[in-house]
A protein has these predicted regions:
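Helix-to-loop junctions at the C-terminal end of transmembrane segments
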Residues: 68-83, 274-287
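A membrane-interface helix-boundary motif in multi-pass transporters
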Residues: 86, 172-189, 368-392
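Structural signature of the two symmetry-related core transmembrane helices
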Residues: 86-103, 289-303
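Intracellular juxtamembrane helix-capping segments at the cytosolic ends
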Residues: 131-144, 327-341
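Helix-loop boundary and gating motifs at the non-cytosolic
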Residues: 4-65, 226-231, 236-253
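A late C-terminal transmembrane helix in Major Facilitator Superfamily
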Residues: 343-374
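Glycine-rich segments within core transmembrane alpha-helices of 12-TM secondary carriers
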Residues: 150-172, 353-364
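Loop-to-transmembrane helix entry
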Residues: 50-61, 151-154, 252-270
């Protein structure tokens, strides 16, 4: 084996390790969020916050994420050219985030007098935790060859999917446990994981195919990127309405409430399995095409879930819907890194996460308003996911086709000249 081949193999191994690291980071962070959601009603009650206000706190979190995810992505673009700085930036903010997170159950235990401190800690935690979403993924776009990005994006999103799959079981296990120990354990594990980012960053920079050069100012986003982000909001809204509002009632047509903890993860099994073969298509055809096709196929799967006449059919439809969402999210990260290739990788990836947070906020607002309980809005909530995924999917395919035609026209112009 030549030294060039050996170097390529080492680079691939390091890249795959970076992808696995990002998967673990997303897994630990998402499980921490799940732990927070499980215990928030109890902790809020200890400081005198009414149960009806808990949803408002969760909406506040998502509103903060909508702003700070993009802000952290922009900050990552400015810091990433200085090797090692991004890891230090993420590590420092994670330490502050974990400190605020650990303090929540202890402050809540002091009673209603600590209500203001409790809210302040939640705000600090929400702001600083945004450092764990877009900034680490920015490294893939800045320091890896483009063909490897879809597979590494699939690896990174695997952590998100695994967390979604185990969340129902985590809720059952932690339901009657004291909050302090889970908060401490999840924070320690998250901090240790985040502190390893500097090492991962240096490994990716070392294997970068091109020598380091001064960072150029990021170019302003044009029309296609903005349409991409709007489409991401619509796709994410379809996911939120289907999975968080409609899926459980779909299952309850054929199963008992106690069975939901076994049935809800079917969606995430499809999510985790489909991303990797879809990453091959994304590598060859681009993220926009995969997003659009997955949106249309996902709309058909949701339609199948809506019309399912038995549990087996519903399980298959939910598996396919999860597979479609996995393809959408993986290809969205890949497309965001490609769109931001001019130095705005963090900004565009941050906008993707902001879109996810905005869609979550909209779903929570619908729940807070009781729309799912109003008969006149039931058809809207049932069919909105189909509309969201089909409209956004078709729009993305049109954009992808237009860009392909422009590329072909430019290629012909160059060849003729």
């Amino acid at each position: 084996m030549s030294s060039l081949e050996l170097s390529a193999d080492v680079s691939t191994i390091r890249a795959n390790r970076a992808g696995v690291y990002l998967a673990v980071l997303q897994l630990v962070f998402t499980l921490g969020w799940t732990t927070y959601v499980i215990y928030l009603p109890k902790l809020a009650a200890e400081v005198g916050i009414a149960p009806s206000a808990v949803i408002l706190i969760l909406m506040l979190d998502q509103a903060i994420f909508t702003i700070t995810d993009t802000a952290m992505g922009i900050a990552a673009d400015k810091i990433a050219p200085f090797v090692g700085r991004l890891g230090l930036f993420v590590g420092a903010l994670t330490a502050l985030s974990c400190a605020a997170f650990v303090a929540l159950p202890f402050v809540a235990g002091t009673g209603p007098v600590a209500q203001a401190w409790f809210i302040a800690l939640i705000v600090i935690w929400a702001i600083t935790s945004s450092a764990l979403r877009a900034p680490p993924l920015t490294l893939l776009g800045k320091h890896r060859a483009k063909p490897s990005v879809p597979f590494l994006s699939a690896l990174a999103m695997l952590g998100y999917g695994l967390a979604g799959a185990v969340s129902p079981y985590l809720g059952v296990v932690l339901r009657d446990q004291d909050a302090r120990l889970p908060f401490v354990i999840s924070s320690v594990v998250l901090l240790v994981t985040a502190l390893a980012l500097s090492r991962v960053e240096r490994g990716l920079v070392q294997d970068a195919s091109s020598p380091e050069k001064p960072a150029e100012p990021a170019k302003p986003l044009g029309g296609v990127p903005m349409i991409f982000i709007v489409s991401m909001v619509i796709l994410a809204l379809g996911y939120q309405l289907h999975f968080s509002i409609n899926s459980a009632p779909f299952y309850l047509r054929f199963a008992k409430p106690a069975d939901l903890q076994w049935l809800m993860p079917v969606f995430w099994i499809g999510f985790n399995i489909a991303m990797f073969p879809a990453s091959v298509v994304t590598k060859r055809r681009g993220g926009l095409i995969v997003m659009g096709a997955a949106g249309l196929l996902g709309a058909l799967a949701v339609l199948g879930a809506e019309l399912a006449g038995n549990l087996n059919t519903l399980i298959v439809a939910q598996f396919l819907a999860g597979a479609a969402w996995g393809c959408m999210l993986m290809s969205a990260i890949s497309a965001a890194l490609a769109i931001g290739d001019s130095g705005a990788e963090g900004k565009v990836v941050g906008l993707v996460f902001s879109a996810l947070a905005l869609a979550t906020f909209a779903r929570m607002a619908a729940v807070a308003g009781g729309l799912q309980k109003l008969p006149e809005y039931a058809p809207l909530l049932h069919w909105a996911p189909v509309a969201c995924w089909s409209v956004a999917g078709a729009g993305l395919l049109v954009i992808a086709a237009s860009r392909l035609q422009q590329s072909v026209a430019r290629a012909r112009g160059v060849s003729s000249s």
